[in-house]
Amino acid sequence: MNEKCTVRRAFVASGQVQGVGFRPFVYRLAHEGGLTGTVGNTSEGVRMEVQGAEAEVRRFGQRLQAELPPLARLTGLKEEELPPVAQEDAFAIVQSSGHAGHSVLVSPDVGVCADCLADMADPQNPRYNYPFTNCTNCGPRYTITRSIPYDRAVTSMSCFPLCPRCAAEYANPADRRFHAQHVACPVCGPTLWFVGKEDAAAGRTCPQWVSVQDKEALTRLALERSGQVLLDGG
């Protein structure tokens, strides 16, 4: 086959491929190879359709298996030849689709990564001291997922619409939070509150919010006075 002729090939990846930065990874591979097409989550895993020169499509398939994101695990990869699509000029992440009778592995929750820890430690960073800082390489998955395919709309994060800054990160292919479904910040994401003994005794279930620094100070004070600190993940 002429390696410069245009071909179109579908790949269906199964395994731990949702909630692990797999679609952004595919998006970058396609752009680096000058390929057009689509990628989207399904209830079987992730479906990709790529179109371009035969050599680049073949290289895409090789890199797909050799350069997986850190949290991704492939258990299967199906390929299918498709007829080329005329006048297609871009590669896009498309809306997820699901079908009854299929299942996909859901990624476990992942401890905070070094990059996010650096964000939390930087006083100039918008996520300074924010306890729910995460990206495509870390953060909650399994415990916030209600159904598959994995998208923000079917997770606990659906209650927290993205602020303009987080939305810009989510839409930026060069950002490590590109298409991170659980992305959040102090402006738009979950927060914590401190309930003292007096609040509980008085039946106050919605005390005033306090900052991370205030919570740390109150927690230290409670421990210094031989108090108890309860963390509720509900």
Residue map of PLM features:
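Short intrinsically disordered, low-complexity segments
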Residues: 204-205, 226
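Glycine-rich N-terminal segment of FAD-binding domains in flavoprotein oxidoreductases
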Residues: 229-234
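Flexible, low-complexity linker/loop segments at domain and module junctions
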Residues: 214-228
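Intrinsically disordered, low-complexity, mixed-charge
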Residues: 1-193, 200-202, 209-211, 220-221
